[in-house]
A protein has these predicted regions:
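Hydrophobic alpha-helical segments, chiefly the membrane-spanning helices
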Residues: 1-317
């Protein structure tokens, strides 16, 4: 348990430093602030989940890696987004309805297709990573004109968030963050697998619960803090982006490193719950265009569904 707590704490701290160092390095190398925000920062914020999945797969615990990806998406919608909506209504932009959310639904269906045979292999991993490359391209293209004025404002906002520090210092922060990320991910995986052995549950269940919630804590803290400050309009976009990267980058790792077979529960219970929550979010976002946002009532429904999933998980252990 101590290893898990220390691993989570170090993971959250090092992920922040890794993103800071990577963004500052990219800025010094001439990348535009907008491109940094769409690639370096977006992928960097998923670094904890990616590193944990890599370490778990390398240790032969592919179930923990897959559970982390699916469980994090369930927690992002049913816990993080729900609590944020309970604090303040979440505005929904037209672009999110027309582009990012349909993309998330399509990627969720792609992940389901990869899991349909209860096997996650090399071909599945390559397919998911190819989807990641296409997604990054689409995200970049979608920020092009005719939304030039909006893009400039977004670029200015990104520039304000990226530290302007010397290249040598940026590289040092990047290396320190990456090193601590690797060590803390290793400690977290070790602690999680030990708990699985202690309680006699599968590493998939630990990935779906302890690890998934733990790696979602930064998103929860950031979303709640933004909502309390009145900046809750970015929360929905962040969750959608995080879920996309979880499925394409995190879920790909066990397929690439340690191809494995799963029990039917991962498809009928866990994936089905993730898909249902994703479709429910899409429906709520579409209805929110007329109602002015995803409000407390919707947040309550999402949290109730999240709680019901954990009840089902408990009774199917």
């Amino acid at each position: 348990m101590l290893s898990i707590i220390a691993g989570f704490a170090a993971l959250i701290w090092s992920a922040d430093k890794f993103v800071e160092g990577a963004a500052a390095t990219a800025r010094q190398l001439g990348m535009s602030p907008l491109l940094i925000g769409l690639t370096v920062v977006a992928l960097g914020t998923s670094a904890p989940e990616i590193l944990v999945s890599i370490m778990a797969a390398m240790d032969g615990h592919a179930g923990l890696a897959a559970g982390n990806a699916i469980g994090s998406n369930i927690a992002n919608i049913g816990l993080v987004l729900a609590i944020t909506a309970l604090i303040a209504p979440l505005p929904v932009k037209n672009s999110l309805i027309l582009r990012e959310i349909p993309l998330l639904v399509a990627i969720t269906l792609l992940a389901g297709w990869c899991l349909l045979d209860l096997h996650l292999g090399l071909v599945d991993g390559i397919l998911l990573l190819s989807g990641l490359a296409i997604t990054l391209y689409l995200l970049f293209r979608w920020q092009k004109p005719p939304l030039a004025a909006e893009n400039q404002q977004l670029a200015d906002n990104e520039a304000d968030e990226i530290p302007d520090i010397p290249l040598a210092r940026a590289l040092a922060i990047l290396l320190v963050g990456l090193t601590v990320l690797l060590v803390s991910a290793r400690a977290l995986v070790w602690g999680a697998t030990e708990i699985a052995l202690l309680f006699g549950v599968s590493d998939l269940v630990i990935g779906l619960t302890v690890v998934a919630i733990g790696t979602s804590l930064p998103e929860l803290a950031a979303s709640v803090a933004s909502a309390l400050k009145g900046h809750h309009d970015i929360a929905l976009g962040n969750i959608v982006g995080s879920n996309i990267f979880n499925l394409l980058a995190v879920l790909a790792m066990p397929g690439l490193i340690a191809p494995t077979h799963f029990e039917t529960e991962i498809l009928l219970r866990d994936y089905a719950s993730m898909l249902a929550l994703t479709l429910l979010l899409a429906a709520m976002a579409w209805l929110a265009l007329r109602r002015g946002g995803i409000g407390r009532y919707s947040g309550g429904i999402l949290f109730a569904c999240y709680s019901a999933y954990y009840v089902a998980l408990y009774f199917t252990l």
